[in-house]
Amino acid sequence: MGLTKSDLFTREQNDLANMAKAIAHPARIAILQYLVKKNACVTGDLVEELGLAQATTSQHLKELKNAGIIQGTVEGASVCYCIDPKVWKHYKNVFHTFFGEVKIEDSTCC
């Protein structure tokens, strides 16, 4: 049995790639920005705010929830979403470390 593509890379590289993938859609960025701005649990107003279909919004929320960056709790017939502060801080630290590791002077490109 051969190696999978993810086996070719370090755990840190795979984790960073998965984190980037989780937020790598403009709708997900918009959702995160909205949740940060509201700084509270948000329910149905996301669909109206984004202008996307309910199913599309739900799919993006599912991806963010699977990544752990948001939490969802059931409140009656709806789900209330908010940023998971612990995971948010982890994302921030990982990306900060990644971009901080490489010191690029004015121009190193050809």
What are these regions (language model features)?
Residues 61-62:
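Short, hydrophobic-biased segments on the C-terminal half of alpha helices
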Residues 1-15, 37, 85-110:
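Amphipathic alpha-helical dimerization/coiled-coil segments
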Residues 14-53, 75-87:
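N-terminal helix-turn-helix DNA-binding core of bacterial DNA-binding proteins
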Residues 48, 65-66:
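Alpha-helical residues within the helix-turn-helix
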